[in-house]
Amino acid sequence: MLYSRESRTTVLFLALVTSLTVLCHSVDVTTVFTTSTITEITTVTAAPQPQNKAETALNTATNIIQTMQFLFNCAPFKWKGPLKITSCALNFIVLLLTAWGYLLKYLQENKLNSDADMEKMVGLGFGEMVGRIFGKGVGKAFTKMDITQKLVYPFEGSNRQKCLLMTVGENSIVPFHDLSTEICFDQYTLDSLSHHNHGSISILDAGSVSALGFADISSKMPSVSELYTLFGDYTIEVLGGITKLASTLNREDWQGERNGFAVLSRDRPNQTLLSVHMYSSSLL
């Protein structure tokens, strides 16, 4: 775990080196301008539809810096009471869902549609998997989280549901050791969730976002914008579930409970598009 001033310096130095590495090796120098705001609710941000390789690489460098900022916020020496720990939990859940969403997008874009393809990616390990999607520099930062993962199949069928199970190890910089996160979905989940009826994040009501506990976050903030890229018109439901889980992890007895949320289809109320549960590995 990180406690000393030397450790803090190491984290920031690694963020700088990895971001410069991506820029030096990936960016075809063109005129690209971007604005990024790092807030307490830090998340991985990227343009929904990058226009060129330079923009993609620049967004990847931003991902690295913000990922390291996330790690820095979660380190014990940065804790300042329950609010700080809740912020860390919120960041962590958003990050896991973002990584899962981009995994599915990566598989779709590369026409890797079989369960075997997904199992191969998951089998790489969390850090290496993220590195394959975003770049090696980002993957190295994620390796510090010491997360093991596997794909499980709770139900049989032609379009059977799959669950990505991710468990935090003892050496993780994330302070929720032995925490397992179970994200269950089917092959059509991402397309169903990311459908944008109105094509713009502006359709999200800022009041609805604030009512979930994000009083200082508008629908234009990076965390909400990134989630909207993946979850579209279902972003409010997902944010509500994330808030519930973050609150649960802030309690000392979270290890003894299984908590989660489900996103139901609006077109087919009996159909679950996505479910997310978090619990101690001892409950497996």
Swiss-Prot record:
Q: Which stretches are Extracellular in the membrane topology? A: 105-284
Q: Is the keyword Membrane in the record?
A: yes
Which intervals lie on the Cytoplasmic side per UniProt?
A: 25-84
Instruction: Please list which residues make up the signal peptide.
Output: 1-24
Q: Name one GO cellular component term.
A: prospore membrane
User: Where does the record say this protein resides?
Assistant: Cell membrane
Q: Which residues are glycosylated?
A: N270
Membrane topology qualifier: Single-pass membrane protein
What does the UniProt keyword field contain? Answer: Cell membrane, Glycoprotein, Membrane, Signal, Transmembrane, Transmembrane helix
Ranges annotated as spanning the membrane: 85-104
Q: Among its keywords, does the record have Signal?
A: yes
Family stated for the protein in its record: To yeast YNL033w.
Q: What is this protein called?
A: Uncharacterized membrane protein YNL019C
Organism of derivation: Saccharomyces cerevisiae (strain ATCC 204508 / S288c) (Baker's yeast)
Q: What is the lineage of its organism?
A: Eukaryota, Fungi, Dikarya, Ascomycota, Saccharomycotina
